[in-house]
Structures are given as C-alpha cells and as structure tokens.
Amino acid sequence: MKERKFKNIKVALVGNPNVGKTSILNYLVKGSLKIGNWPGVTVEKKEGHVFFQDYYITFIDLPGIYTLEETVSEDEKIALDFLLKEDYDLILNIIETPRMERDLYLTSQLLDIGKPIILVLNMIDEAKDLGIEIDVERLSELLKTKVIKTNGRTGEGIEEIFPAIVEVYEKNIKP
C-alpha cells in the first residue's frame, strides 16, 4: 500500500482584536485547537491542524493587531514579528464587516507584505442587519485577492475557506 503524501500549507489568521478569528478557527479545525504560549512570553498561541484533500493545513491564530506600524503591546509585537519574520504560506485576513472601513487599514498593510492573502468578511449577518451590502466580486477585483463572506457564530460560509486556501496556495495568487 502506497503511503499518502500531503502538501503542507501554513496559514496565518490575522485581524484586529475581537473580529472573530478564534471563532472561525474553531470551525475550521472542528474544536481541535491547541493552546500554548509564544516562546518567552505569556501570550497565548492558538494553533490548529486539518487534513483537506491532499493538504495538511496548519492555522496559526495571531494576537489581534490594528497596524503593522507602531506596536505597543506584547500581543501586537508577537503578531508583527510573526508576519515579518516567520515562514508561512498565506494570510487569512479576518475583518469585522460592520466596521470594515476600520479593518481595511490593516488589510492594506497586509497586502504590502506580498504574501498570498484571502480576505474573510466576518459578521456578515450584523452587516446585513445594518443594511450594509458588500459586492464581493468588486471588492475582490479592487484588492486583487479572494474574498469570502462568513458568520463565525453560525459557521455560515466557512466551508468556502478550504478550497480558497488550496486555490490561492496552488496558483500562488498574490495581491
């Protein structure tokens, strides 16, 4: 019997604090989240792993960060150091759709890193309740990246993330 080989994909979950990164991660890894600490600090490190098709996907849930410029907290420094110095394949940028204008500031900085990125519009239900409509195709075209609508509380749209990761990884789609 031939041993199955999996391709490894390492995904950084990035976004402002409290945008639902951990909720989405819990859906992605179906609760098999490993929580530890970043080396040398007491800040939690959340990591999850999933097999999807021929891929072994590792998700790293980075501490919330508002900007890649000045960092003040230990959490922000950890996120920034990871994004600029560590080896990972793509960014899953989670934003809070009702506060999209605020969150897109970080997105614009992440696009400048040059890594493949998928934009996840979370809390889409709240945006809809506020009368906010998002043209996903147009936003994707403007940012030159894949855009997915989700609801981290119900899991709606999260199943679209796996094929998007594989597509962006395989095609090496960069902004």
Predicted regions and their residues:
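Helical mechanochemical/support elements of P-loop NTPase systems and associated helical scaffolds
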Residues: P39, V43, D75, D87, ...
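Conserved C-terminal guanine-recognition region of P-loop GTPase G domains, centered on the G4
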Residues: F51, I78-V147
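Signal for well-folded cores of large energy- and translation-related assemblies
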Residues: V29, T67, L83-L84, L111, ...
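Conserved G1/Walker A P-loop phosphate-binding module
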Residues: M1-L68
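Canonical P-loop GTPase G-domain recognition
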Residues: A127-P175
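Alpha-helical scaffold segments in soluble metabolic enzymes
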Residues: S23, Y27, I78, E160, ...
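Conserved nucleotide-binding/hydrolysis micro-motifs of P-loop NTPases
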Residues: G40, G64-Y66, T97-M100, M123-K128, ...
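Short glycine-rich substrate-engagement loop in P-loop NTPases that contacts/grips substrate
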Residues: L68-K77
